[in-house]
Amino acid sequence: MGCLLFLLLWALLQAWGSAEVPQRLFPLRCLQISSFANSSWTRTDGLAWLGELQTHSWSNDSDTVRSLKPWSQGTFSDQQWETLQHIFRVYRSSFTRDVKEFAKMLRLSYPLELQVSAGCEVHPGNASNNFFHVAFQGKDILSFQGTSWEPTQEAPLWVNLAIQVLNQDKWTRETVQWLLNGTCPQFVSGLLESGKSELKKQVKPKAWLSRGPSPGPGRLLLVCHVSGFYPKPVWVKWMRGEQEQQGTQPGDILPNADETWYLRATLDVVAGEAAGLSCRVKHSSLEGQDIVLYWGGSYTSMGLIALAVLACLLFLLIVGFTSRFKRQTSYQGVL
């Protein structure tokens, strides 16, 4: 009986432990794409994400940042939000002017493409970190570090001259510091509070198997599709029993139109060795009840297996106690 109790306790601990979901962080990432066809034609568009959710967009044809979620303003007042948008309008105008001046000064050839990635991440305890990176023609050239601009190791030589000019602009450097160190963490904290119900949502994946194009004579390409899950982190592997198949090739995690995600994982095998293979899916929404699909059509859930084991153990425990109680009653009758 002691062994049976131990097994029951161990199984319960395993079930509870597997349901734990690690704490997620939600960085705010703002992406700016600026195109300069020549000195007179330019276009700048922007997007922003909080974690995996797109929250804002900014079209070149508009002076207003578009909110894509009901909670995209966070806890900012209307006045704070308008002030922030005014700063962005001034920034966009200044950025366009400065790039044209640098192109002339450094004799850069049009067309020019620049990308800016900036934002911050708030950690428990109100600690935060931030970033501001600039790329030219698709390659990182500089970033804002602490109180000044610094070149990347791969930056062309002319970037050093541009940085000398940028670092002389004290007002701009102080504004960037204020936005990254103060405004951004405050804004993100408000977004996390206002959008917490959507940010913490869990959507269970759906999974199915199919056969891909034949990789060669006598071989099969097994495909495991996983779709409709949120949040993005997911674990998908082809298995033989409990042994992971090292040949598993996961694809990119792609977005669905409903803000969930899709992934497929393939395995190239000899046709005669496909029997006994399965695809296992782990995701936080499943709470430890992994999806397992067997090649050939059968389906099971590791959670259901665990529940079945617990039910059997509980049944045996009840039977054991009942039997022991009857024996004790019988002994008392004899005495």
Curated annotation (Swiss-Prot):
Entry-linked InterPro entries? Ig-like_dom, Ig-like_dom_sf, Ig-like_fold, Ig_C1-set, MHC_class-I_related, MHC_I-like_Ag-recog, MHC_I-like_Ag-recog_sf, MHC_I/II-like_Ag-recog
By its UniProt entry, which SMART domains does this protein fall under?
Answer: IGc1
Motif stretch (Internalization signal): 331-334
**Residues annotated for a D-galactosylceramide binding in this entry:** D98, D169, K170, W171, T172
Q: Which tissue types show expression of this protein? A: Expressed on cortical thymocytes, on certain T-cell leukemias, and in various other tissues.
Parts of the chain on the Extracellular side: 20-301
One Gene Ontology CC term in the entry: external side of plasma membrane
Tell me one Pfam family matched here: C1-set
Q: What is its main location?
A: membrane
> Which residues are glycosylated according to the annotation?
N38, N60, N126, N181
Ranges where the Ig-like domain occurs? 185-292
UniProt xrefs under PROSITE patterns: IG_LIKE
- Localization of this protein: Cell membrane; Basolateral cell membrane; Endosome membrane; Lysosome membrane
Q: How does it sit in the membrane?
A: Single-pass type I membrane protein
Q: Which GO terms describe its molecular function?
A: beta-2-microglobulin binding; cell adhesion molecule binding; endogenous lipid antigen binding; exogenous lipid antigen binding; lipid antigen binding; lipopeptide binding
Q: Which SUPFAM superfamilies match?
A: Immunoglobulin, MHC antigen-recognition domain
Q: Where are the transmembrane segments?
A: 302-322
Which Cys pairs does UniProt list as disulfide-bonded? C120-C184, C224-C279
Q: Which PANTHER family does the record associate with it?
A: ANTIGEN-PRESENTING GLYCOPROTEIN CD1D (PTHR16675:SF175), MHC CLASS I-RELATED (PTHR16675)
Entry function: Antigen-presenting protein that binds self and non-self glycolipids and presents them to T-cell receptors on natural killer T-cells.
The annotated subunit structure for this chain is: Heterodimer with B2M (beta-2-microglobulin). Interacts with MHC II.
Q: What is this protein called?
A: Antigen-presenting glycoprotein CD1d
Encoding gene (name): CD1D
